[in-house]
Amino acid sequence: SIVTKSIVNADAEARYLSPGELDRIKSFVSSGEKRLRIAQILTDNRERIVKQAGDQLFQKRPDVVSPGGNAYGQEMTATCLRDLDYYLRLITYGIVAGDVTPIEEIGIVGVREMYKSLGTPIDAVAAGVSAMKNVASSILSAEDAAEAGAYFDYVAGALA
């Protein structure tokens, strides 16, 4: 978080936090309630978000759920939805933290290579994350959707 980064930087230079760093921390703290509210709304609506995003993805990419597709059959479709749920959870972590560090450290590094080795169409996973953004945006206020949208975009971009 901005708090940890500011402290680590100041300590590395054996100095007190600067006025600018303190202002950034104050802004981070004051926006905390908003970030927590957004994360709570996404958490409370996670099943709806994942299901509707999956429906949108499978409608847009029927090849994924057709015979021979990576999400063909009930078990593989459930695996695909599980992955979307995982990315939604990571997104809520990023929102709460106010940056993408938890997303990077917990679940994005190495993902592209893993999906390639499994033969999973990475663009379909990224499209699923974008579909979750669309569903979440319909649940959130415009301001909250803009805040959360950056995290969905980050994950989709990291997968693409």
From Swiss-Prot:
The modification N4-methylasparagine is found at N70. It is found in: Cellular thylakoid membrane. Pfam families: Phycobilisome (PF00502). It is a peripheral membrane protein. The keyword Electron transport applies. Contains one covalently linked phycocyanobilin chromophore. InterPro entries: Globin-like_sf, Phycobilisome_asu/bsu, Phycobilisome_asu/bsu_sf. Keywords: Antenna complex, Bile pigment, Chromophore, Electron transport, Membrane, Methylation, Photosynthesis, Phycobilisome, Thylakoid, Transport. GO terms for biological process: photosynthesis. One of its GO terms (cellular component) is plasma membrane-derived thylakoid membrane. Its main location: membrane. (2R,3E)-phycocyanobilin binds at C80. Component of the phycobilisome. Heterodimer of an alpha and a beta chain. PANTHER family: ALLOPHYCOCYANIN ALPHA CHAIN (PTHR34011:SF2), PHYCOBILISOME 32.1 KDA LINKER POLYPEPTIDE, PHYCOCYANIN-ASSOCIATED, ROD 2-RELATED (PTHR34011). Light-harvesting photosynthetic bile pigment-protein from the phycobiliprotein complex. Allophycocyanin has a maximum absorption at approximately 650 nanometers. Belongs to the phycobiliprotein family. This is Allophycocyanin alpha chain.
